Amino acid sequence: MLEIGDLHVSYGQVEAVRGVSLDLQPGQIISVIGPNGAGKTTLLAAAMGLLPCRGTLRFEGEDLQGLDVEARVERGLCLVPEKRELFGELTVLDNLQLGAFAKRLRGDAMKKRLQSVYDRFPRLAERRSQRADTLSGGERQMLAVGRALMSAPRLLMLDEPSLGLAPLIVRDILAIVRKLREDGVSILLVEQNARAALESSDHGYVLETGEIALSGASAELASDSRVQATYLGGGTHDDD
């Protein structure tokens, strides 16, 4: 479904992602874990078309290189960014409607898509007229995911969805991620909370200083002594 091969991404003279290869099959949840500054956010930004890159980047067999962000959304990719990037002065409803912009939904089609999001996140329905900046952290993350779902993605990329959230809220958000997979949405999950990421995914990659250090089935990575020593001693939520 998503094929990333020998990907390189640079900021000026600094190469932030170096030769990364990753394969995501339909119906999978793939996690990418690693320390702050490892290049996780950069990897997602390149996949979404927000940063130029070199290497292979294909979605459902189509070369993504040269396609802008809107074109990638139209093809079924969507990114929930690390800081959620909501429009705080706008209502929950306004933010959700903006998520459907690339699909150009109108009338009944818009109402149907909104209802599908409200069915998944009843709290957003209750707060549809509230400004986004009045929501709690967990509600803002729900809104960020709901806005992404307005474009009906087949592949949803999530950047640090647990950032700044209490453990119980993290559990709820990751339960939503697993339910999305059951409903046919494939997931690329970037997390610094390695334990939560590996518990929620099928396959994992460990990214360190811009390179893949380890990869394998998530359960196997969780049992790896190197992963346990470095990443499972205690979760942190620093920005990437």
Segments predicted by a language model, with ranges:
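Glycine-rich phosphate-binding loops of nucleotide-dependent enzymes
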Residues: 1-240
